Amino acid sequence: AVLGSGARVFFLAKAEIEKWPVFGKLAKSGGTLFIQRGSGDSIKIREQITAFLKQDIPVLFFPEATTTDGSKVKKVHGRILGAAIEAQRDVQICLICYVNQQGGLDQVSPFIGNISFAEHVKKVLEMPQVTAHLVALPAICTAGHTVESLTALVQQKMVQGLADLHHKVLKSQPNMQQA
């Protein structure tokens, strides 16, 4: 919601979200592209993303294929980045850091763990003030990149960018090892 609030973008999400009552319908009506992990859908989705990008319609997705607690960057799955290469469009990395009132990483805002989405929304609505810090890194030109080289570069930029963001906004620094 933080990233999608500022611009018209299409969001890439796991297929299970499409079946969620209310939120699934909202996501679908907002133009979300749903992908079934491990089903071979990634080729079809990549083609759709390429078509959107060629029309200058941004597509938002989590390259780690999940959300995290914000303490570190997980492995980037780069297959979808191939769409940006095919469409000859830059890749824009955005990082979010949720900071609680004590100046540490907030553990309620990120949708992680084994709770339902409804439970998560309830916890978010009940929590004290949290600040979402959003940073957009310089765009990465995809020209001359393979999926592998672009994935490695995105991984490196995300790790360094998150470390820099933590240094800037947190009172105490989490362990920044890559997962």
What are these regions (language model features)?
Residues P21-K25, I57, S71-L153, L165-N175:
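A cross-family acyltransferase "interaction/gating" segment
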Residues E18, G40-D41, T68-D69, T142:
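Glycine-/small-residue-rich active-site loops that bind phosphorylated ligands and cofactors
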Residues K14, I35, F62, C94-I96:
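Generic beta-sheet signal
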Residues E16, T66, Y98:
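Short, glycine/serine-rich, charged loops/turns that create anion-binding
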Residues I43-V59, P63-V76, L81:
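Soluble extracytoplasmic domains of inner/organellar membrane proteins
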